[in-house]
């Protein structure tokens, strides 16, 4: 049984990536590992703990949404909240778990108008040693 790592942030493109990752995993009999990567706060004041707590709370909500999507597909997932920028988090988890592939949406939140790809998929395509599937949002 292989593993597929999916980057998920709760955005429309994240939903599309999760759906694709779940479908591929179901077809291949693989396990899905959903990753929410977030940059840890810098050293700029006393609000660091509150900031980190809020981001982790958001990550837990995003993972609950991912588990709900997975249940609809009949696929069990594992989830990881990783305090690193998204691309770095995905590469680290994929390497640690010897993943078959990484699946991400073409944009996260917020989308910059006119960009061909968001920064996370762009970095993954250049830095990942594993195959990367970039999925556009369904409503694009």
Q: What annotation goes with each model-predicted range?
A:
Residues 50-61:
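A short acidic, glycine-rich active-site loop
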Residues 23-26, 92-95, 126:
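Solvent-exposed polar/charged
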Residues 36-38, 105-107, 136-137:
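Short secondary-structure boundary segments
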Residues 30-31, 75, 99, 130:
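Short glycine/serine/threonine/alanine-rich loop segments
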